[in-house]
Amino acid sequence: MNQPLSYVHPDAKIAKTVVIEPFSTIDKNVVIGEGTWVGSNVTILEGTRIGKNCSIFPGAVISGVPQDLKFNGEDTTAEIGDNTVIRECVTINRGTSDRNKTVIGKNCLIMAYSHIAHDCLLGDYCIFSNNSTLAGHVTIGDHVTLAGMVAVHQFCNIGRHSFIAGGSLVRKDIPPYVNCLLYTSPSPRD
């Protein structure tokens, strides 16, 4: 059900049970699955693929142009799995020619003000607390939790079932099943 005060591009493929609140924008080349709710003031840009039963809260921007100087307008995507919740003011960039997509798995919770950069791959059942930030090309396994204000350096990998404590800076790979209570990986000068 589209509100008259939202804009939906005529080429967007929106399932019949999708609810789009006022003042949201849905661009061309977008697919949104059954039962998904799009809050007010959400911007869903070209190349977005959203699964079934997702919730996108106000102020979120999905599939923004990658913040990568090598990006040259390639046809890339940002994909969000079924039952995922994207909270207020989250930004998710689409991929570059490196991976061609940014992927958020199924049953994830991405809390307010988090940023997921281009070419990131997130597994299923991930939880990102407020202000968690991934630089480009990061890979996150299933069931990973990032507490508030975690920053992950580009090209890092975080193994499945890991937990990263709030305020941590991750500059190196984290193996699976690791509980990082406060992690700031050593500086190259240390």
Predicted feature residues:
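Structural signal for interior beta-strand "rungs" in well-ordered beta-sheet cores
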Residues: 2-180
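Conserved small/polar residues in nucleotide/adenosyl-binding loops
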Residues: 183-190
